[in-house]
Amino acid sequence: MDGCTAVLMDAASAATETSAVPEAWGGDVAPFSVARVTSTDIEEQAASLNGWNQVYEQMTPGRFVGKLHELRFSGVQLFRETSNQAVHESGTPWAGSRAVGVPIEMDSTARFGGQPVDTDALVTLGPADELDFYTPRGFDILGLAIDADVLEAHARQVEHRDIAAVFGTRCVFKPGTVRLNEFRRSLLSVLQSLDANPTALQFRQTQRVLEQTMLGAVVAVVADEAAAPEVANPRRRHIVDSAKDFMRSRIAETITVADLCIELGVSRRTLQYSFQEVLGINPIRFLRAMRLNGVRRDFKNPGPLASSVQDTAANWGFWHLGHFVTDYKRMFGELPSETLRHTRRSATVARP
């Protein structure tokens, strides 16, 4: 792995593959870890999830096989865990975190905090909550643990919601099929994309974009769908103009929708409606266009990070390489590799 250390450990009961960037690295390189674990020992499976204090007890007879795929960076931990036997799980996530989970597949109904859980449910633990989870055979779940204070601040500043009040003391949510499927797809997309391109996580901009994506996804899946307050047209024009000024003043940075909401003091929905009415485009597409142009500028003026399409894209917050290539070609009519190749060819010709 480029710029990372890789360790492969094999044991009779577990195979663990981990990759990480050391905490001591500075500059634009950010610490992260990626782990894949296959266990045939239930205690080792319980201990595999980084930062959690767990006890697993096998409840059905037969050889246990469990798997874990985990990403951790900044204040975000994203994982997918599978087990073939029924298990009772108890314990706590890492201190100060809000954890949510969405089942992908199960042979029968699970129980979380004593409540029945199927694939149409989302489960959650707050910072002071303890895990009490009975999982059936053939269980497959996506989990996300994120700093609770950061989540509450994001919900308050960007979404204008009190997410702590939304969660309350509830441990099981039924968000509805559409919202839950969207949340599930979002988490799976991140895991699968970074499995193919884990070095994208070494860039702080990528981590920042992913963190805000995860924060927004959690708020969206559990928050009630309340109507956004009406904003007068002149106010919307001012919001859009101010947003554009802010983006242009920080053209070298990866600005996100959350940054705009905080800077302008408006909710995500107000920003969305304002851009749609004034420009006929949503702020996400507008920001993506600005970032694509930023990547193209780097290709045209190559520095150390322009040595590869993958690294340059990741430095601008494009963590999904396939989506980036598609968006880039749609925007500029050529592949990013073609732009970079043209630039290198021109530099060679211009050389005396």
Predicted regions located by residue number:
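Short, conserved glycine- and acidic-residue-centered signature motifs
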Residues: 93, 236, 288
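Conserved hydrophobic/aromatic beta-strand scaffold that supports enzyme active sites
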Residues: 70, 78-80, 100-101, 122-124, ...
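Alpha-helical bundle regulatory/interaction domains
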Residues: 2-63, 109-251, 256-258, 262-268, ...
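Short glycine/proline-enriched turns and hinge-like loops at secondary-structure junctions
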Residues: 91-94, 135-137
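Short, conserved beta-strand element in jelly-roll/cupin
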Residues: 93-109
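Short hydrophobic/aromatic patch on the recognition helix
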Residues: 271, 275, 323-324, 328
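Conserved short histidine dyad/triad with adjacent acidic residue
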Residues: 61-68, 72, 76-93
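Generic hydrophobic, amphipathic alpha-helix propensity
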Residues: 239-240, 287-292
